[in-house]
């Protein structure tokens, strides 16, 4: 019995350690990032529809293309911290792939709304299936930059699966090494910092950055971190007295908390939004709590 338990535990541990996708940051500095993508495995399911059998490709925890009537293939999206005024350019340093023949990749049904039963939507092949070319055509895509509180970021999308619907060949890139250089010219969402925007990185946001940005390195992690971010409680005026003990308790815990009557914050959704934005610009705001029913807080 002991041996059986040990074997079961070993199998469970191995399954937890194994990942279909492994990503390693080989080098990271102010000028560039070198990142290695490894696709260890993937899942193939057979889907039957109107006398045709399709291959459904699944890469655990990774999204798939949802362009209607185009091959529904997985891709890998990861974010990187970039400079405030430049963007990412990509160079493929190395790659290798395997080819799978006699494939028939299932077409995507598109981005289905929640009020529609996906089983009622048919599988339809679009014009892509008539072209003697691989889809997607590019091994990678670079999305527009965005700002997330303390940093400007950019998503690099790797397309390790490419399918030619005429030859029925699917390429799977098992290993790709990309060099991401911060000399791109995409000026979307440039980050103009002000003295008031130079916030300390709060603990909760630091955890978020670690999960989101592959190049959130020790240099960023050791930036001075405040104990906790601030909270504002926007409360329906008649309930403010009842919330005073809650606010006192939060302050005693070390979370600087400000109680704001709704009449002070504003009597419309836009006014309250402007109040929160102004508070955010001048404080280390992390938490917002609304107190009141939907008719009391617009």
Short names for language-model regions:
Residues 19-290:
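Extracellular pro-sequences of secreted precursors
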